[in-house]
């Protein structure tokens, strides 16, 4: 192995031809011989460059509809041969194999083909075979071969050649080899993931998780932790696909909280009215519907004004001027919405630190997806919690049935509870949260905390009666004892929604009847950890 390897011969075979011609011209200007295949060779020739077809090197034409182009010893031998190994050099001479110093390959657009909704056969045809084989060969032999798999690396190569007078150094080749192996790993992960979905495999024997670096973050949850943001290439609207119009770079916590906020607000379809969710530390501190977006924000903000400071705001409709004006009254880290009109953007222009993201759509809360969580020595995979219920799914278990207004609020509270860390208790009144208890080890403590925060907020707003009076309450899991339910009743709740299923359901139902509560069971739990 030597540090500097002059580039004399390069093989270029790319699907994405962005930057191809300038790269070819720069290499040719340095006297590098260009080998190529199919459309890549055609593009280079049309630019006036001399190109040797790989089929002329191998003595075999491209065949089987292009499935076989580069799978030949004269290609792979040129990539894999150790230049300081006498036996390898002798074999190259005997078989007329020329060394290849540079490989430039990007792969068939398999991921884009799948994303476009192509049928099974079309996806199969877009699985690259020769490309990954060459990439892996060149990467393995990075002691002597430079391999490029990303258009973004072309300029880096030209800079390296300029700095090293037409050669590449070992550190550069090693870095490009790492990029190459990461690319083939991600490509294979995409193929295996697609086939897993196509075969409806719930738990395949092996599962690969891959992503592309979107942003190197200043730090993680805390300043002493390194962090980065990777995207998986899916087109689900959200923080990964959003356009940032202003403000500082997103932090690790911003990204995590913004995702939580947007997924929550997407539970409320825009055609059913404007909705707003305010998130702090991945938990909602206010969620509401309103006649206007500004009203929805104001109602959500009134749930817990203290916690909303420095929070994340998500909207289910494009941000407008009046809503932007209302939001501007408090320090906010991020606002995410399907869009933002010019008036709203002009209002926010004065808030230099506020990050405004738009997504051109909402994520589908019913779309199948997976959630992945790392544990020591492995990771957990599960279906995304897309569980939802309607009026017809509710089972009235108390003597008093809830009114239509109570049912509307119960269903609203149930949607919110799904997005609150367990144990979750959510009080709702008139389409707005009025108390949220999250993340407590005891369900009754969550009920008490939510009630106390509502009372504190009423005092801060100068209200004689806490908003929690006449509210409904949702619990993400069953009440194991009557105490949590009775705490809610004492706070002013009139109706309850919960999964049911406790050994003490009969006792809890009796307590609800004694307190004059209406209660419905959903038969569905929404634990969130």
UniProtKB/Swiss-Prot annotation:
A molecular function GO annotation: IMP cyclohydrolase activity
SUPFAM superfamilies listed in its UniProt record: Cytidine deaminase-like, Methylglyoxal synthase-like
Gene from which this protein is expressed: purH
Pathway in which this enzyme or protein is active: Purine metabolism; IMP biosynthesis via de novo pathway; 5-formamido-1-(5-phospho-D-ribosyl)imidazole-4-carboxamide from 5-amino-1-(5-phospho-D-ribosyl)imidazole-4-carboxamide (10-formyl THF route): step 1/1; Purine metabolism; IMP biosynthesis via de novo pathway; IMP from 5-formamido-1-(5-phospho-D-ribosyl)imidazole-4-carboxamide: step 1/1
Domain of life of the source: Bacteria
UniProt-listed SMART domains: AICARFT_IMPCHas, MGS
An annotated GO cellular component: cytosol
Keywords linked to the UniProt accession: Hydrolase, Multifunctional enzyme, Purine biosynthesis, Transferase
Domain MGS-like: 2-149
Pfam families in the record: AICARFT_IMPCHas (PF01808), MGS (PF02142)
UniProt similarity note: Belongs to the PurH family.
Entries under InterPro entries matching the protein: AICAR_Tfase_dup_dom_sf (IPR024051), Cytidine_deaminase-like (IPR016193), MGS-like_dom (IPR011607), MGS-like_dom_sf (IPR036914), PurH-like (IPR002695)
Cited CDD domains: IMPCH
Catalytic activity: (6R)-10-formyltetrahydrofolate + 5-amino-1-(5-phospho-beta-D-ribosyl)imidazole-4-carboxamide = 5-formamido-1-(5-phospho-D-ribosyl)imidazole-4-carboxamide + (6S)-5,6,7,8-tetrahydrofolate; IMP + H2O = 5-formamido-1-(5-phospho-D-ribosyl)imidazole-4-carboxamide
Gene Ontology BP terms: 'de novo' IMP biosynthetic process
Protein name in the entry: Bifunctional purine biosynthesis protein PurH
Enzyme Commission code(s) on record: 2.1.2.3, 3.5.4.10
């Amino acid at each position: 192995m030597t540090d500097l390897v002059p580039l004399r011969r390069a093989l270029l075979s790319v699907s994405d031809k962005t930057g191809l011609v300038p790269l070819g011209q720069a290499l040719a200007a340095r006297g590098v011989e260009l080998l190529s295949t199919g459309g890549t060779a055609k593009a280079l020739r049309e630019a006036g460059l001399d190109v040797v077809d790989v089929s002329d090197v191998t003595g075999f034409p491209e065949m089987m509809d292009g499935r076989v182009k580069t799978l030949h010893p004269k290609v792979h031998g040129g990539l894999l041969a150790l230049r300081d190994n006498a036996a390898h050099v002798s074999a190259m001479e005997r078989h007329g194999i020329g060394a290849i110093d540079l490989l430039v390959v990007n792969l068939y657009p398999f991921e884009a083909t799948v994303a476009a909704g192509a049928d099974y056969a079309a996806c199969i045809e877009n699985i690259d075979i020769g490309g990954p084989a060459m990439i892996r060969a060149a990467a393995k032999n990075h002691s002597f071969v430079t391999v490029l798999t990303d258009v973004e690396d072309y300029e880096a190569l030209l800079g390296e050649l300029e700095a090293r007078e037409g050669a590449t150094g070992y550190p550069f080749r090693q870095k490009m080899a790492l990029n190459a192996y990461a690319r083939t790993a991600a490509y294979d992960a995409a193929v295996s993931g697609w086939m897993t979905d196509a075969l409806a495999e719930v738990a395949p024997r092996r599962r690969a998780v891959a992503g592309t670096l979107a942003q190197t973050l200043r730090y993680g949850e805390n300043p002493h932790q390194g962090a980065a943001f990777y995207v998986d290439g899916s087109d689900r609207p959200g923080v990964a696909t959003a356009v940032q119009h202003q403000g500082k770079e997103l932090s690790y916590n911003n990204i995590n909280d913004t995702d939580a906020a947007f997924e929550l607000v997407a539970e409320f379809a825009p055609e059913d009215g404007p909705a707003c969710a305010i998130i702090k530390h991945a938990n909602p501190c206010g969620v509401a519907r309103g006649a206007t977006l500004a009203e929805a924000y104001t109602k959500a903000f009134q749930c817990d004004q203290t916690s909303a400071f420095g929070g994340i705001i998500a909207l289910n409709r494009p941000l407008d001027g009046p809503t932007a004006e209302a939001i501007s009254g408090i320090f906010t880290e991020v606002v995410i919405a399907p869009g933002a009109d010019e008036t709203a953007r002009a209002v926010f222009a004065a808030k230099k630190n506020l990050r405004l993201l738009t997504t051109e759509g909402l994520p589908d809360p019913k779309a199948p997806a997976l959630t992945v969580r790392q544990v020591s020595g492995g990771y957990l995979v599960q279906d995304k919690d897309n569980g939802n219920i309607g009026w017809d799914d509710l089972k009235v278990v108390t003597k008093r049935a809830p009114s239509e207004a109570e049912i509307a609020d119960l269903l609203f509270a149930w949607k919110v509870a799904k997005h609150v860390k367990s144990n979750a208790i959510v009080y709702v009144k008139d389409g707005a949260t009025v108390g949220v208890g999250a993340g407590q080890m005891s369900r009754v403590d969550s009920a008490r905390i939510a009630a106390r925060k509502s009372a504190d907020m009423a005092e801060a707003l100068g209200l004689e009666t806490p908003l929690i009076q006449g509210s409904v309450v949702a619990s993400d899991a069953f009440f194991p004892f009557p105490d949590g339910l009775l705490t809610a009743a004492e706070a002013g709740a009139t109706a309850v929604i919960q999964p049911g299923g406790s050994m003490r359901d009969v006792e809890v139902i009796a307590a609800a009847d004694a307190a004059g509560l209406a209660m419905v069971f959903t038969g569905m739990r929404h634990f969130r950890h």
